[in-house]
Regions:
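Fe-S-dependent hydro-lyases/dehydratases of central metabolism
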Residues: 1-188
Length: 188
């Protein structure tokens, strides 16, 4: 019996994978700052294995190259753990409320990448609570530097895909997010 991935216990203790990733990044920045100031530190308790070295001339598929580039590597192989920087994040109105709640709990002050919020699922005949969400969610997204489309502007995939470049890595808050170029990962 083995637990896969190796980080699952740490993810549980941290309250989830996102919190573990944030904790590791904060810890790494704090350690770097302490080293610059000459302050002695201990190694962090939670470490994930570094990607195994790839041999010189290792062939990669286009998808492996795109994800690797977004993670600062020439490519990735099956079993590698990487944290690629997404170029685009799509959000739609039915999941946007949960996204806002998570970001508020994390005290987010701005988006790290291009964030596009659409209102394509409730635009046709919004109930009064939908209209309120459309207004308040758009204000929230704009305040954090994202792009909030207006109700009736169209479907997120059509509008969002206009922002894609061939090397982009992105994600969207539903099961059918896909980019016509680049690579995308559905989050729903």
């Amino acid at each position: 019996f083995s637990i896969e991935p190796a980080s699952i216990r740490d993810e549980y203790r941290a309250g989830g994978r996102n919190l573990l990733i944030i904790e590791r990044k904060l810890t790494s920045r704090a350690l770097e700052h302490c080293r610059k100031l000459g302050i002695q530190t201990k190694d962090p308790a939670v470490k994930l294995p570094a990607p195994t070295e790839t041999r010189s001339g290792q062939p990669f598929s286009l998808a492996q190259k795109l994800v690797g580039k977004a993670a600062g590597l020439p490519g990735v192989l099956p079993g590698h753990y990487v944290e690629p920087q997404a170029h685009l994040v799509f959000s739609q109105d039915t999941t946007g409320k949960m996204t806002r709640q998570e970001l508020e709990e994390l005290a987010c002050t701005h988006f790290a990448t291009v964030f596009i919020q659409s209102f394509c699922h409730t635009a046709a005949g919004p109930k009064s609570k939908d209209a309120l969400v459309q207004h308040t969610l758009a204000e929230f997204v704009n305040r954090l530097g994202g792009i909030a489309l207006k109700p009736g502007d169209g479907i997120i995939h059509t509008n969002g895909n206009r922002f894609c470049l061939p090397y982009f890595v992105g994600t969207g808050a539903d099961s059918h997010t896909r980019f016509p170029i680049g690579i995308s990962f559905a989050a729903g």
